[in-house]
Each structure stands twice: as structure tokens, then as C-alpha cells.
């Protein structure tokens, strides 16, 4: 597909707009056909391979087991090395940590009689089945597996509904378990009812408990999922169970599993039903879901998958939906594996957040009341892993689909309005989980508006965020949930306002890390203030963004200064650069670099550009000069986790952009691949995959809340990004595994020697032509005045 675009003269910092046009080459292969959903299903990626749509409410995917009934094989429900499947659940989250989440209402075909309760099948020895990857197929919007019990399973999805086929073998019982209580981390209530006359099963499960085992206050339920399942074959029998009791001919069941330690439900608890069919039956089932009501689940199903729909038809619709979404970026060149890795990363980006409103516009709010989307929205969204996705995910989503970005922003504002004015940092369905640190909703909204998402109540959201950043609440002063799930939106805000840093003893998950996160949040808030015309607020929050300097100890080590914990009295506790004391999922050596909006200021505190370069070189390399990109110890980068993802781009500020090109390509080539272990750690609802997409395009949104793009080098010879403001054409005809260094760049036909692009590229589009070579041109982009901008504290 090609579209006209407006070209912008970037060479003069886009001061003059030039009219123009270009036509993108059609992609040689269907983007959806190149997706490999099994990427990330091992190595801690925690992705799932099942059927879903872009941002879909339903994700129908297998639940694997490693022989423990109350534990999923991996968060996300699927582990490539786990040899058994115990069900196919209707909901999943991709790339999470902890013990998992969602995994609601598993359906499981079994070819034996149901003689004991599935809830006491402690080792998944009776009602699970082995499978082999040779009998498995996954594609965008479709999943199929032939189980060792002889049943062939096919799954496909619409936005709020899905369809499955269970082809049972001849000569064996044909039973289908509906394990309604068995969400991945348990449930507090479950109900299910069989109507044999209409061949329908309906029910609901009440769950939540994401990372609840880390804080007792969060071991709770906060959503209910309703489902309606309509079958095309008559039921020959039915039954139910509750805990250890089995009821032959039962048509109802009630009872959740409850919650237990370590994030998993207790053994021996739960409820569900089963239905039987004639031996050898080919059974089709259409399922609608809703987080509001059974009536809405039924309406969602009827609207999306009418009774005459076939599974091949739904599979094709899902394929087309993914093609349309993925085709927002067209690439040409590279290897087949590189193209598959790229489009699978973009696929993972578009899995979350998720549509949470029904076809009638209703959704369950954080106050557990039913609400309706407002006039600006097309949908309400849920599942916001803020600490992760504010870094580069929401920028990409919004640039490609500005209405989705706008709806996410409005959804977050609605959540805050329904949550006593608090913007939670990690939301799951209709609940606040408080997981991680900082105040990521602020940069999230600033990211969205910077990349083209404008259809939300910016004035109202800004006022709400300012209040949260300036008025200390009881939750901000509470230790509930700490360390990992501190309940305050701005933990220890009183210290921030009084000390101008978060102290070593606080109501936060690490004073130093919280200080850096709050500094980024306040910088983003200054950007929102600029957008709404609040000059005083812009100056106030830009000044506060500079508070990170109060935790820089120039005498931390004989080798140089570090950002570290600081006591409330101003003294410095004992310190070593490998410590994680005061930080979140990273060491002081990693967090030293996390000042993305004021990199020049950081370099100055380190003693100047040359000293910063020396420390960056040591950060990315072992003593022998080899790369240290992950698992090299706490003194080095961890490019498998968020605190390090911006660091390879810092060489652009240091006058050595060729080192950014080199480091980013090393990560792309060695840590990412077209294989189950092809994501280096938790994908975190698509955040890490978004980093890969940006890096493969040769650019990155370093500064929270702004649309400047730092430059690396393109992986592909040709790419077209159909962005919110216009098409961006990226040509690098010499791109190859060897030719990774930028020797020259033209923008809209004019020579360009800066290793970054101003916001006008995102806002209006443009044409980039890279000259790449196997050897670096160490002069290109190296001049001091060519470096990307920094934003120091405001001074009158």
C-alpha cells in the first residue's frame, strides 16, 4: 500500500515546509505471514503463541504445564520447553513477570472419562496432554496443535470473541473441560452453567492478583470476566466439580480457587464443568467475553462472529486485521529471519494495551461501576505496564495509530478519575496493582501527544497530574505494598517537595531510582505544561526535573562520581558501583545514565564528554574489549531490561555516533532472533519489542515526552513508516550485516550531519537517505553543535 505524504525540509531544522510526495514500494511478503508468534516463548520472553487481534480483548492461547496443576509453566501461559498443555485460556498478557496474570477460563479437550475432580489433579497427570512442536502451528490470529490424546485444536479470534474447533479422535470419549476457576494466579469466585437445550455454556470468574504475592494488600481480586460459549454439536452428557467433589450430570458449578503464597492458587481448590460429545465429533464453539456482563458477552459474540461464521473465515479476517496493522511499516531488504523478527516485534508491540470496552461502549471502571466511553473515544483500554512502555512503546503505537494512542491517554485519565485521582503505574483490567516505581503516566501522556495523539482531554489530564505531583496524599506517605508495589502515585512526595530528592529511607522502591523516575516525570510534566500554555508550570517542573543532580555524589568512588542513595540529613551512605541499593531492577552503574532529558548535564557532572565516553566504553565492554550487553555483571549494561535500553544511544550526544550504530547493531544481531529464545528477557507487554522496531529502523525516541529521534543505522535497505503526520521514507541501499556505519545522510535531498532528527519528522514526514559502509566515518555527526538537545533546569 502506498499513500501520499508531505515532505519536510529537515536540514534547516525543518524551518521551511516543502510540498512533495513519494510512493512506497509494496512489501514483497505479507507482513502477517512473516510473524512467528513463538518468538519469545523461552529465555524469559514470556510471550504466548495463541490467537488474538491487534489490541484485542480476547487472547485464546494454550496453558502449558511442567507438572504442577496450580502453576503455569511461565507468565503468559506458555513455555516452549514445557511438554504438556492443560487448557486453552481466553485471556493472556504478553511478556509479564511475577507469576503471570489473566489466563482466564481454560477449555481442555480430554479423551478419557471424568472420574475425579480436575482440581485435585495435582501433577496434571490425568487431564492434561503431551504435545510436540512438529504438530503445532502458530500465526498472527490463529493457533493449531494436535495433542497426543488425538484431539486437533484450532483457535482464532475477533476483538471481543473467538472461535475454536476441537476434532476428537474416533473410538475414545470426547469430553471438554471448562475450568472456569483456573485463572493463572487463581480466583476468588467462579460460576458456570450448562444449558443443554441451547448447547450453551455461560459463566464468570473473578480474579486479579497480579504480583499479589509480593504485597499482601494486593493479593486481591479486581475484575470479573464473563463468557458465553455456543456450540454447534449436541451435548451427550455433562458434569461439574467443586474442589474434590465430582457431580455426574451436573449443570452448574460455583467456587474460586482463592489465592496463596508465591502467586499461585492452592492445590485442590476450584470448580468447573465438562460437556461430552459423540466419539469422533468435530466440535466448533464460538465464545464471547465481556468484563461487564453476560449480556454484553453475548452481544459481543453476536456482533463479531455470527452463527454461520466458519473458522477459516475468522482466521482470514484475523490475518487481514494483522496485515492492516503491521502494514503501517513497510520494509524491504534484509534476510527472511530479520524480516520475521521485525514484524513479530511489531506484532508484540500491538498486543497491548487491550480494548476493554464492549461493542456497546460499556466497560468496568476502577470504581467497579459500569461506564461508557466518551465522545472522543473509540474504545477504553486496559493493561498498562507504565514503567516499561513509557520508554519507547507508546511513542511507536501512537505514531502508527494516533487514535489508539489518544484512546489510551483518555483511558488512563478515566482510570485516575475512578481511582480517587490517582494514576496507577501498572494497571491490569479494572484494577490498580502499583507494580514498579516512578510516575510513568506523566511521560506516557507526554509521549502520546508528542507522537500525534491529540484526541483526548489534555487540559483535564494535565490538571489531574499536576495535583498528584504537588499535593501529598496519604498513599504517598504509606508503606503499603512497598517495596515493589508502593501504593502512592508519587511515593514520598513530601521528600521530593522538601528535600528535592527521595531519601534512602522512604515510602518508595529505592530512593535513588525513584528520584530519577520522578525527574523524568517532572520533565514530561513540563512538556505537558508547554502544550497547554502554562508557562509557570513549565518552568516549575523543568526546575524540578533537575533534582536528579542532588543525588550525584562526585566523590562516590576514586574513579568518579555516581548517582546514589542519600540520607535525609544530606549524608551519603556507604556505596559501591555494583550496588542495587536504592534502585529498581538494576545497579548504580546502570542507573547512572538514566537522565534522558539532560544528557549534556549528566556528561558535565561526570567531568566532560571525554570522561563520559570512557565510562560508556567500559559500561558496554569487558576488560578484553568484547561486548558486555547482558549477563556481564552489575557494572555493565543489561540490554534485556528497561533501565539500560536508552544507553546505547548516548554516544550520539558524545560526538561518537558511530559507537551508537555499532552498539545498537550488536544488540539487534546477537540478542534478537527468529527463534523461541529470540527476545532477551521479559517483553513487558511489547516494550522491549518496540525497542527492536525502533532500532531496526535506525532511530530512537530518547527524550520522554518529546519527538526528537536519535539516529543509529537502518537494518533494512528500504522502509516506509506510515506515521500520524505523514510518511517517513528510509532508504539505506547498502544496508547489510557488515555495512552498519553512517558515512552520510540526506534529509529531503539535502545533506544532513546531525545524529538526531527534530520533531518535525514525526509531525510531517520526510525522506531519509543513508549512505552506509563497513567502516565508520568518525567525523560524521561528531561536531559539538551537531549533538542532540538537552533540557537543563530552568533558571530565570
Positions of PLM-derived features:
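Accessory carbohydrate-recognition regions in carbohydrate-active enzymes
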Residues: 25-443, 449-516, 529-550, 556, ...
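Sec/Tat signal peptide C-region and signal peptidase I cleavage site
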Residues: 20-24
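ATP-dependent phospho-/nucleotidyl transfer catalytic cores
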Residues: 521
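Bacterial N-terminal signal peptides that target proteins for export
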Residues: 1-10
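Bacterial N-terminal signal peptides
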Residues: 9-18
